[in-house]
Regions:
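Transmembrane alpha-helices and adjacent helix-loop boundaries
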Residues: 1-166
């Protein structure tokens, strides 16, 4: 196994660990400072993740995935406006934050007067409903087959084929 494959593997795990660290910080702020256990954070995390993925993936070929309707394809739509800085990634993050924030505000308005156990039960139901929607609705997120071909941020910044020359 090449050293660059190992480094790529470690970096991938570090990114996943960073994402879950941010998730746990959000849960800690809510549960730690207010004492209210809110499992709905996982659902809003999923909404943000799927929104950013849906904005950046390209639409699949209809012959294979006829039910899947979305695919923003931001990297190709921005084209030269991208300016070499992966502007699509920033737009996808902003879109994900806005979408998750709007959904969290709507659910928050419905659950604002609930206390402790009832809030935990309600937000568990919300998070599970969101998970099941993304898992089962083929038109939204390709159902149980999941999303694929999600572009990497700064994915082609380094040409690894040139590393073998040195």
């Amino acid at each position: 196994m090449e050293i660059f494959g190992i480094i790529d593997y470690v970096v991938g795990w570090a990114v996943v660990a960073g994402i879950y660290a941010i998730f746990s910080l959000g849960l800690n702020v809510h549960w730690g400072y207010t004492g209210l256990f809110n499992i709905g954070v996982a659902g809003f995390f999923a909404i943000g993740a799927y929104t950013s993925a849906l904005l950046t993936t390209s639409s699949p070929t209809p012959a294979l995935f006829e039910d899947f309707k979305f695919g923003g394809d931001l990297p190709n739509r921005l084209g030269s406006f991208n300016a070499g800085i992966d502007l699509w990634f920033l737009i996808a993050l902003i879109g994900a934050a806005i979408t998750a924030g709007i959904m969290a505000a709507l659910i928050g308005l419905l659950t604002i007067r609930l206390r402790e156990d009832y809030l935990a039960i309600t937000t568990l139901g919300v998070a599970e409903t969101i998970r099941l929607i993304f898992h089962n609705e083929k038109w939204l997120a390709n159902g149980s087959r999941g999303l694929y071909n999600i572009p990497k941020f700064l994915g082609d910044a380094v040409d690894l084929s040139l590393i073998h020359i040195s």
